[in-house]
Protein backbone atom coordinates (compact mmCIF):
# COMPACT_ATOMS: atom_id res chain seq x y z
CA UNK A 1 0.00 0.00 0.00
CA UNK A 2 1.18 3.51 -0.83
CA UNK A 3 -0.06 6.52 1.11
CA UNK A 4 0.39 10.20 0.20
CA UNK A 5 0.19 13.05 2.69
CA UNK A 6 1.45 16.42 3.81
CA UNK A 7 3.80 15.97 6.75
CA UNK A 8 4.63 19.43 8.11
CA UNK A 9 4.36 22.91 6.66
CA UNK A 10 4.92 26.59 7.34
CA UNK A 11 2.73 29.44 6.11
CA UNK A 12 3.56 33.14 6.10
CA UNK A 13 0.83 35.77 6.29
CA UNK A 14 1.62 39.18 4.80
CA UNK A 15 -0.50 42.21 5.65
CA UNK A 16 -2.35 43.83 2.75
CA UNK A 17 -1.95 47.26 4.39
CA UNK A 18 1.46 48.56 5.33
CA UNK A 19 1.65 49.84 8.91
CA UNK A 20 2.23 53.56 9.34
CA UNK A 21 5.31 52.91 11.46
CA UNK A 22 7.23 50.09 13.08
CA UNK A 23 5.48 50.91 16.35
CA UNK A 24 2.08 49.99 14.89
CA UNK A 25 3.29 46.67 13.45
CA UNK A 26 2.82 44.63 16.65
CA UNK A 27 -0.83 45.63 16.88
CA UNK A 28 -1.34 44.82 13.23
CA UNK A 29 0.42 41.45 13.63
CA UNK A 30 -1.95 40.56 16.47
CA UNK A 31 -4.90 41.52 14.26
CA UNK A 32 -3.63 39.12 11.60
CA UNK A 33 -3.14 36.39 14.19
CA UNK A 34 -6.67 36.90 15.55
CA UNK A 35 -8.10 36.69 12.04
CA UNK A 36 -6.17 33.50 11.32
CA UNK A 37 -7.24 31.86 14.58
CA UNK A 38 -10.87 32.76 13.87
CA UNK A 39 -10.90 31.46 10.30
CA UNK A 40 -8.96 28.30 11.12
CA UNK A 41 -10.78 27.59 14.42
CA UNK A 42 -7.30 26.77 15.67
CA UNK A 43 -8.03 27.17 19.40
CA UNK A 44 -11.22 25.16 19.16
CA UNK A 45 -9.42 22.39 17.30
CA UNK A 46 -5.92 22.32 18.81
CA UNK A 47 -6.42 24.07 22.13
CA UNK A 48 -5.76 27.40 23.82
CA UNK A 49 -2.87 29.49 22.56
CA UNK A 50 -0.57 31.23 25.03
CA UNK A 51 2.32 33.66 24.76
CA UNK A 52 5.58 31.88 24.09
CA UNK A 53 9.18 32.95 23.73
CA UNK A 54 10.56 29.41 23.62
CA UNK A 55 10.89 27.33 20.47
CA UNK A 56 9.58 30.00 18.12
CA UNK A 57 10.27 29.58 14.40
CA UNK A 58 13.82 30.69 13.72
CA UNK A 59 14.23 34.44 13.38
CA UNK A 60 10.92 35.41 15.03
CA UNK A 61 10.80 37.29 18.34
CA UNK A 62 7.21 36.99 19.62
CA UNK A 63 4.57 34.33 19.28
CA UNK A 64 1.95 31.95 20.57
CA UNK A 65 1.91 28.18 20.97
CA UNK A 66 -0.57 25.57 22.18
CA UNK A 67 -0.79 25.37 25.95
CA UNK A 68 0.24 22.05 27.54
CA UNK A 69 0.11 20.03 24.32
CA UNK A 70 2.55 17.36 23.11
CA UNK A 71 2.59 18.68 19.55
CA UNK A 72 4.34 21.74 18.15
CA UNK A 73 2.24 24.52 16.66
CA UNK A 74 3.36 28.14 16.62
CA UNK A 75 2.18 31.53 15.38
CA UNK A 76 4.93 34.15 15.44
CA UNK A 77 6.13 37.53 14.19
CA UNK A 78 9.15 39.80 14.63
CA UNK A 79 8.60 43.21 16.17
CA UNK A 80 11.26 44.90 14.01
CA UNK A 81 10.88 43.19 10.64
CA UNK A 82 7.49 43.71 9.02
CA UNK A 83 8.58 41.91 5.85
CA UNK A 84 8.87 38.63 7.79
CA UNK A 85 5.10 38.67 8.21
CA UNK A 86 3.27 36.31 10.56
CA UNK A 87 4.63 32.76 10.56
CA UNK A 88 2.25 29.81 11.02
CA UNK A 89 4.12 26.57 11.69
CA UNK A 90 2.44 23.15 11.89
CA UNK A 91 4.59 20.20 12.94
CA UNK A 92 3.61 16.85 11.44
CA UNK A 93 2.00 15.81 14.73
CA UNK A 94 0.09 19.10 15.08
CA UNK A 95 -1.25 18.81 11.53
CA UNK A 96 -2.32 15.21 12.14
CA UNK A 97 -4.15 16.24 15.36
CA UNK A 98 -5.72 19.24 13.64
CA UNK A 99 -7.17 17.03 10.93
CA UNK A 100 -8.40 14.44 13.44
CA UNK A 101 -10.05 16.97 15.76
CA UNK A 102 -11.48 19.05 12.91
CA UNK A 103 -13.29 16.01 11.51
CA UNK A 104 -14.66 15.11 14.94
CA UNK A 105 -15.90 18.65 15.61
CA UNK A 106 -17.28 19.54 12.17
CA UNK A 107 -18.12 16.07 10.86
CA UNK A 108 -16.07 16.60 7.71
CA UNK A 109 -12.44 15.96 6.80
CA UNK A 110 -9.97 18.73 6.11
CA UNK A 111 -6.87 18.79 3.92
CA UNK A 112 -4.27 21.50 3.45
CA UNK A 113 -5.97 23.08 0.43
CA UNK A 114 -9.20 23.42 2.44
CA UNK A 115 -7.36 24.98 5.38
CA UNK A 116 -5.73 27.51 3.06
CA UNK A 117 -9.08 28.27 1.42
CA UNK A 118 -10.62 28.84 4.86
CA UNK A 119 -7.91 31.16 6.17
CA UNK A 120 -7.71 33.14 2.91
CA UNK A 121 -11.31 34.30 3.30
CA UNK A 122 -10.17 37.75 4.45
CA UNK A 123 -8.89 41.09 3.19
CA UNK A 124 -6.41 41.56 6.04
CA UNK A 125 -3.61 39.39 4.67
CA UNK A 126 -2.37 37.09 1.94
CA UNK A 127 -0.92 33.67 2.70
CA UNK A 128 1.84 31.62 1.10
CA UNK A 129 3.77 28.49 1.99
CA UNK A 130 7.42 28.97 2.85
CA UNK A 131 7.93 25.25 3.48
CA UNK A 132 6.03 22.04 2.82
CA UNK A 133 7.09 18.44 3.47
CA UNK A 134 5.46 15.85 1.20
CA UNK A 135 5.51 12.20 2.30
CA UNK A 136 4.85 9.06 0.30
CA UNK A 137 4.75 5.95 2.48
CA UNK A 138 5.42 2.41 1.26
CA UNK A 139 3.57 0.23 3.75
CA UNK A 140 4.23 -3.53 3.64
CA UNK A 141 5.69 -3.12 0.15
CA UNK A 142 8.86 -5.00 1.09
CA UNK A 143 11.36 -2.36 0.03
CA UNK A 144 14.61 -1.68 1.87
CA UNK A 145 16.21 1.68 2.60
CA UNK A 146 19.57 -0.05 2.95
CA UNK A 147 19.27 -1.70 -0.47
CA UNK A 148 18.24 1.51 -2.23
CA UNK A 149 21.09 3.44 -0.62
CA UNK A 150 23.66 0.79 -1.56
CA UNK A 151 22.41 0.76 -5.15
CA UNK A 152 22.67 4.55 -5.34
CA UNK A 153 26.10 4.71 -3.73
CA UNK A 154 27.40 2.04 -6.14
CA UNK A 155 25.87 3.95 -9.08
CA UNK A 156 23.66 0.97 -9.97
CA UNK A 157 20.71 3.32 -9.61
CA UNK A 158 20.53 7.03 -10.39
CA UNK A 159 18.05 9.81 -9.68
CA UNK A 160 16.52 11.94 -12.43
CA UNK A 161 14.02 14.76 -12.65
CA UNK A 162 10.75 14.40 -14.56
CA UNK A 163 12.37 16.18 -17.50
CA UNK A 164 15.00 13.43 -17.72
CA UNK A 165 17.93 15.40 -16.34
CA UNK A 166 20.18 13.80 -13.75
CA UNK A 167 19.50 14.98 -10.22
CA UNK A 168 23.00 15.71 -8.96
CA UNK A 169 22.05 16.24 -5.30
CA UNK A 170 24.65 14.91 -2.88
CA UNK A 171 23.99 11.54 -1.22
CA UNK A 172 24.51 11.04 2.52
CA UNK A 173 23.31 8.49 5.04
CA UNK A 174 22.91 7.43 8.66
CA UNK A 175 24.49 3.98 8.92
CA UNK A 176 24.92 1.77 11.97
CA UNK A 177 26.47 -1.71 11.94
CA UNK A 178 26.62 -1.54 8.14
CA UNK A 179 22.85 -1.02 7.96
CA UNK A 180 21.49 2.25 6.54
CA UNK A 181 18.09 3.26 7.90
CA UNK A 182 18.06 6.83 6.55
CA UNK A 183 19.61 8.55 3.56
CA UNK A 184 19.38 12.04 2.12
CA UNK A 185 19.51 13.46 -1.37
CA UNK A 186 20.60 17.07 -0.98
CA UNK A 187 21.95 19.03 1.95
CA UNK A 188 20.29 20.90 4.78
CA UNK A 189 20.78 24.63 4.59
CA UNK A 190 19.06 28.00 4.67
CA UNK A 191 18.95 28.49 0.90
CA UNK A 192 18.33 24.87 -0.13
CA UNK A 193 15.03 24.62 -2.01
CA UNK A 194 14.64 20.82 -2.04
CA UNK A 195 15.79 17.88 0.06
CA UNK A 196 14.70 14.23 -0.03
CA UNK A 197 14.89 12.02 3.03
CA UNK A 198 14.24 8.28 2.62
CA UNK A 199 13.99 6.38 5.88
CA UNK A 200 12.64 3.41 7.79
CA UNK A 201 9.50 4.92 9.29
CA UNK A 202 8.67 1.82 11.32
CA UNK A 203 12.11 1.86 12.94
CA UNK A 204 11.84 5.59 13.67
CA UNK A 205 8.41 5.29 15.30
CA UNK A 206 9.14 2.17 17.35
CA UNK A 207 12.52 3.37 18.62
CA UNK A 208 11.29 6.84 19.59
CA UNK A 209 7.77 5.81 20.73
CA UNK A 210 6.50 8.36 18.22
CA UNK A 211 2.96 9.63 17.70
CA UNK A 212 2.26 6.75 15.27
CA UNK A 213 3.90 4.04 17.39
CA UNK A 214 0.82 1.79 17.64
CA UNK A 215 0.21 2.10 13.92
CA UNK A 216 3.83 1.18 13.17
CA UNK A 217 3.51 -2.05 15.15
CA UNK A 218 0.80 -3.22 12.75
CA UNK A 219 3.16 -3.16 9.76
CA UNK A 220 6.01 -5.48 8.90
CA UNK A 221 7.63 -2.86 6.67
CA UNK A 222 7.17 0.92 6.42
CA UNK A 223 9.47 3.12 4.33
CA UNK A 224 8.91 6.82 3.79
CA UNK A 225 10.05 9.10 0.96
CA UNK A 226 9.81 12.61 2.39
CA UNK A 227 10.58 15.65 0.26
CA UNK A 228 11.14 19.05 1.85
CA UNK A 229 10.39 22.01 -0.42
CA UNK A 230 11.26 25.56 0.61
CA UNK A 231 11.40 29.04 -0.85
CA UNK A 232 10.45 29.33 -4.50
CA UNK A 233 9.50 25.63 -4.74
CA UNK A 234 7.13 25.99 -1.77
CA UNK A 235 5.68 29.12 -3.39
CA UNK A 236 4.99 27.15 -6.60
CA UNK A 237 3.10 24.49 -4.65
CA UNK A 238 1.25 27.15 -2.67
CA UNK A 239 -0.03 28.75 -5.87
CA UNK A 240 -1.29 25.39 -7.13
CA UNK A 241 -3.00 24.52 -3.84
CA UNK A 242 -5.21 27.59 -4.14
CA UNK A 243 -6.82 26.22 -7.31
CA UNK A 244 -7.50 22.73 -5.92
CA UNK A 245 -11.06 21.67 -5.08
CA UNK A 246 -10.88 17.87 -4.67
CA UNK A 247 -8.74 15.48 -2.65
CA UNK A 248 -7.72 13.58 -5.80
CA UNK A 249 -6.33 16.84 -7.20
CA UNK A 250 -4.33 17.26 -4.00
CA UNK A 251 -2.92 13.74 -4.33
CA UNK A 252 -1.92 14.41 -7.94
CA UNK A 253 -0.23 17.66 -6.95
CA UNK A 254 1.75 16.10 -4.09
CA UNK A 255 2.91 13.11 -6.13
CA UNK A 256 3.68 15.31 -9.13
CA UNK A 257 5.77 17.66 -6.98
CA UNK A 258 7.86 14.88 -5.45
CA UNK A 259 8.37 12.96 -8.70
CA UNK A 260 9.17 16.14 -10.61
CA UNK A 261 12.44 16.26 -8.68
CA UNK A 262 13.02 12.61 -7.73
CA UNK A 263 12.63 9.59 -10.01
CA UNK A 264 14.82 6.52 -9.52
CA UNK A 265 16.26 4.62 -12.50
CA UNK A 266 18.35 1.51 -13.06
CA UNK A 267 21.59 2.82 -14.52
CA UNK A 268 22.26 0.10 -17.11
CA UNK A 269 18.76 -0.24 -18.55
CA UNK A 270 17.74 3.39 -17.97
CA UNK A 271 14.36 2.12 -16.79
CA UNK A 272 12.38 3.23 -13.77
CA UNK A 273 12.88 1.18 -10.63
CA UNK A 274 9.87 -0.79 -9.46
CA UNK A 275 9.32 1.41 -6.42
CA UNK A 276 9.57 4.62 -8.46
CA UNK A 277 7.13 3.22 -11.02
CA UNK A 278 4.70 2.46 -8.17
CA UNK A 279 4.93 6.08 -7.09
CA UNK A 280 4.13 7.36 -10.59
CA UNK A 281 1.24 4.91 -10.86
CA UNK A 282 -0.48 6.88 -8.11
CA UNK A 283 -1.06 9.68 -10.61
CA UNK A 284 -4.32 10.00 -12.49
CA UNK A 285 -2.49 12.61 -14.51
CA UNK A 286 0.67 14.66 -14.23
CA UNK A 287 -0.56 18.01 -12.97
CA UNK A 288 2.46 19.92 -11.78
CA UNK A 289 6.03 20.87 -12.58
CA UNK A 290 8.20 23.32 -10.68
CA UNK A 291 8.67 26.51 -12.63
CA UNK A 292 12.19 27.00 -13.89
CA UNK A 293 13.75 30.16 -12.49
CA UNK A 294 14.68 32.81 -15.02
CA UNK A 295 18.39 32.62 -15.96
CA UNK A 296 18.82 36.15 -14.68
CA UNK A 297 17.59 35.25 -11.18
CA UNK A 298 20.29 35.31 -8.48
CA UNK A 299 21.65 38.37 -10.27
CA UNK A 300 20.60 42.01 -9.82
CA UNK A 301 17.04 41.08 -8.86
CA UNK A 302 18.18 38.90 -5.97
CA UNK A 303 20.60 41.56 -4.74
CA UNK A 304 17.78 44.09 -4.93
CA UNK A 305 15.41 41.82 -3.01
CA UNK A 306 18.08 41.33 -0.34
CA UNK A 307 18.52 45.09 0.05
CA UNK A 308 14.75 45.62 0.28
CA UNK A 309 13.86 42.69 2.52
CA UNK A 310 16.84 41.11 4.21
CA UNK A 311 19.79 43.44 4.57
CA UNK A 312 18.51 45.58 7.44
CA UNK A 313 19.00 48.77 5.41
CA UNK A 314 15.42 50.02 5.77
CA UNK A 315 15.19 49.35 9.53
CA UNK A 316 18.52 51.20 9.86
CA UNK A 317 17.23 54.21 7.89
CA UNK A 318 13.96 54.17 9.82
CA UNK A 319 15.82 54.33 13.13
CA UNK A 320 17.97 57.22 11.85
CA UNK A 321 14.88 59.20 10.83
CA UNK A 322 13.05 58.39 14.06
CA UNK A 323 15.97 59.66 16.17
CA UNK A 324 17.23 62.63 14.10
CA UNK A 325 14.32 63.42 11.78
CA UNK A 326 14.34 64.11 8.03
CA UNK A 327 17.54 66.17 8.30
CA UNK A 328 19.38 63.27 9.90
CA UNK A 329 18.03 60.89 7.25
CA UNK A 330 19.27 63.14 4.42
CA UNK A 331 22.71 63.41 6.00
CA UNK A 332 22.80 59.63 6.42
CA UNK A 333 21.91 59.08 2.74
CA UNK A 334 24.56 61.63 1.75
CA UNK A 335 27.09 59.74 3.89
CA UNK A 336 26.17 56.44 2.20
CA UNK A 337 26.46 58.07 -1.22
CA UNK A 338 29.94 59.37 -0.36
CA UNK A 339 30.99 55.92 0.87
CA UNK A 340 29.69 54.40 -2.37
CA UNK A 341 31.72 56.89 -4.44
CA UNK A 342 34.82 55.72 -2.57
CA UNK A 343 33.99 52.04 -3.16
CA UNK A 344 36.40 50.02 -5.30
CA UNK A 345 34.87 46.92 -6.95
CA UNK A 346 36.73 43.61 -6.65
CA UNK A 347 37.49 41.17 -9.46
CA UNK A 348 34.21 39.27 -8.97
CA UNK A 349 32.19 42.42 -9.61
CA UNK A 350 34.14 43.25 -12.76
CA UNK A 351 33.73 39.70 -14.10
CA UNK A 352 29.99 39.88 -13.40
CA UNK A 353 29.73 43.17 -15.32
CA UNK A 354 31.63 41.72 -18.24
CA UNK A 355 29.22 38.80 -18.38
CA UNK A 356 25.86 40.52 -17.80
CA UNK A 357 26.13 44.23 -18.68
CA UNK A 358 24.94 43.76 -22.27
CA UNK A 359 21.94 41.70 -21.17
CA UNK A 360 20.79 44.28 -18.62
CA UNK A 361 21.38 47.20 -20.98
CA UNK A 362 18.97 45.57 -23.42
CA UNK A 363 16.54 44.46 -20.73
CA UNK A 364 16.23 47.74 -18.85
CA UNK A 365 16.17 48.68 -15.18
CA UNK A 366 15.29 45.99 -12.60
CA UNK A 367 13.94 48.71 -10.27
CA UNK A 368 10.77 49.66 -12.14
For the regions a language model picked out, list residue spans one by one:
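Structured, helix-rich domain cores that form ligand/interaction pockets
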Residues: 1-297, 306, 310-368
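Helix-turn-helix DNA-binding segment
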Residues: 300-302
Amino acid sequence: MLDVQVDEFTLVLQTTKKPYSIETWSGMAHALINEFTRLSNIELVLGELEDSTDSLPRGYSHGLSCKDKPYYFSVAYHTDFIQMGVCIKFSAYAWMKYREQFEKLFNQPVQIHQLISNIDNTNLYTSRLSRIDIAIDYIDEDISVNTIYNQLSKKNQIVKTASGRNNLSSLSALTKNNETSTFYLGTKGKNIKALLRVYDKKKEQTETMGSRFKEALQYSNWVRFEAVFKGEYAHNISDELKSIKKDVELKNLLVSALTDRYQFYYTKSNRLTTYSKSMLNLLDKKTFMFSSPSPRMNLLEQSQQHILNGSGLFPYLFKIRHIWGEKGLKECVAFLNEEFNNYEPNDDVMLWLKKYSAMYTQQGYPFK
